[in-house]
Amino acid sequence: MEKDDAFLRKLNAGKKVIAIELDSPKDADLTNYLAGAKRLQAAGADLLTIADCPIARARMDSSLVACRVHRELGLCTLPHMTCRDRNLNATKALLLGLYAEGVREVLAITGDPIPTAERDEVKNVYQFNSRKLAQYIVSLAGEGREMPSPMTVFGALSLNARNFEVELRRAGEKLENGMSGFLTQPVLSEQAVENLRRTRETLGERAKILAGIMPVVSQRNAIFMENEVNGIHVAEDIMEAFAGLDREQGEALGLEISLKMAREALPYADGFYLMTPFNRVALMERLIARLKTELLQEQ
């Protein structure tokens, strides 16, 4: 049975969409998570994305959470699926389950490696990379195949890659292997905006691009992202601007910077991929409201 997907319908109609990431719990309780997802849905999010054990730390499974949210809230979901933790059999089994639950979009990524200190107990799998994973996912659909219609596969795009020419070439290869579009790393510098422009210029309209927007909430947060999180670059003037601010002031500044970055990214993007810092749902409700009133009011 074909699924009526409100997110894809809106995206393919040329309307700007809002996807928002909310990390799954570290324990077995989904109560607060579902409450947060419901608030983000009410605020106007078109899609909820769930990371797959980011920085290789175990959390509740992204695909299971996606199914629960989709089933209980009716909100479109995009579980991330890494190549790090599953072999081909486990990947196929999970994809078939997602399809049966009505979750028809996935984000295929290679995934952060297991920290060296933990590799005696936890093993990397990496049977394939994100391009091969995308190719495999789309190969499951068709006459006589396991899925009657294809899943939609998105990928990641690092606007902050040191060699952006290589990143652009890989993006083209990902499209050739079945991906439909990209969610980018956070736009937190003018160079990231320029690389987003180059991406649109190079890939044209064949790729759907959601520009990553993540509010910085403190100087410590900015420094950590700059130094410790792969693929993120925070401009120096942004880091300096948070010096001496308390929580309320930090959130207010982070909100304004996010809106500025979103405004600059808008001409080159099909929508936004919002990342929730420290599960601060109230902050993201404010960001969505202002995006809708200040940037997307004509939709």
Predicted regions and their residues:
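Active-site pocket-lining/capping segments in soluble small-molecule metabolic enzymes
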Residues: 3-8, 111, 124-146, 158-161, ...
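Active-site-proximal loop/turn and secondary-structure-junction residues that shape catalytic pockets
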Residues: 22-26, 52-56, 83-85, 110-114, ...
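Active-site-adjacent beta->alpha loops and helix N-cap segments on the catalytic face
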Residues: 2-10, 29-31, 56-68, 87-93, ...
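Active-site mouth loops of central-metabolism enzymes
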Residues: 17-32, 77-89, 151-166, 242-256
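Hydrophobic faces of well-ordered beta-strands that scaffold small-molecule active sites
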Residues: 18-24, 48-50, 77-81, 106-108, ...
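Structural motif
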Residues: 43, 72, 101, 177, ...
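Active-site cofactor/substrate anionic-group-binding motifs, chiefly glycine-
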Residues: 44-84
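Conserved N-terminal beta1-alpha1 strand-loop-helix module at the mouth
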Residues: 1-50
